[in-house]
Amino acid sequence: MSDDDSRASTSSSSSSSSNQQTEKEGSTPKKKESKVSMSKNSKLLSTSAKRIQKELADITLDPPPNCSAGPKGDNIYEWRSTILGPPGSVYEGGVFFLDITFTPEYPFKPPKVTFRTRIYHCNINSQGVICLDILKDNWSPALTISKVLLSICSLLTDCNPADPLVGSIATQYMTNRAEHDRMARQWTKRYAT
């Protein structure tokens, strides 16, 4: 073997081992990074699960008037809620079912709350989506699911036609209240009793 061949062989083996070292070094931070993000997710999960457990205990001991809520099954992040139509409202006598979905980011992100029971309301669309500021931009970690349910009950008593999700119902509410109320009562009787 000549000196040139020997140098080339040494050079290629040292560059090969340096490549392997770089590859190892490159993969190590990725592993650490994924462990960090997994750890962060676990921490969020445990924070959210603890908070949801506490709220479940609170709502079981002291439910908001005309409301109930709790997990659908074993999954603490999936709840079913029942709201009775507020007395004196066009929804009186109705029983409305809602789905509540918490994310691992709860309480830093709002829960997703949707009506499962059809309802004639300018702030609730046909898919059950609710237009309520505290479920969007005005969410605060200080809010609880009990306060959310109370706000929804309040929305059933006093809708917000100035910020509608269903424009035609809002217009009817403002221009022909008697017809609006008749339709809301009819839907309540048909879908919520």
UniProtKB/Swiss-Prot annotation:
The active site is at residue 131. Gene3D superfamilies: Ubiquitin Conjugating Enzyme (3.10.110.10). Its main location: nucleus. Signal peptide: none annotated. Residues 47-193 form the UBC core domain. Belongs to the ubiquitin-conjugating enzyme family. Accepts ubiquitin from the E1 complex and catalyzes its covalent attachment to other proteins. Catalyzes the covalent attachment of ISG15 to other proteins. Mediates the selective degradation of short-lived and abnormal proteins. In vitro also catalyzes 'Lys-48'-linked polyubiquitination. This is Ubiquitin-conjugating enzyme E2 E1. It comes from Mus musculus. The lineage of its organism: Eukaryota, Metazoa, Chordata, Craniata, Vertebrata.
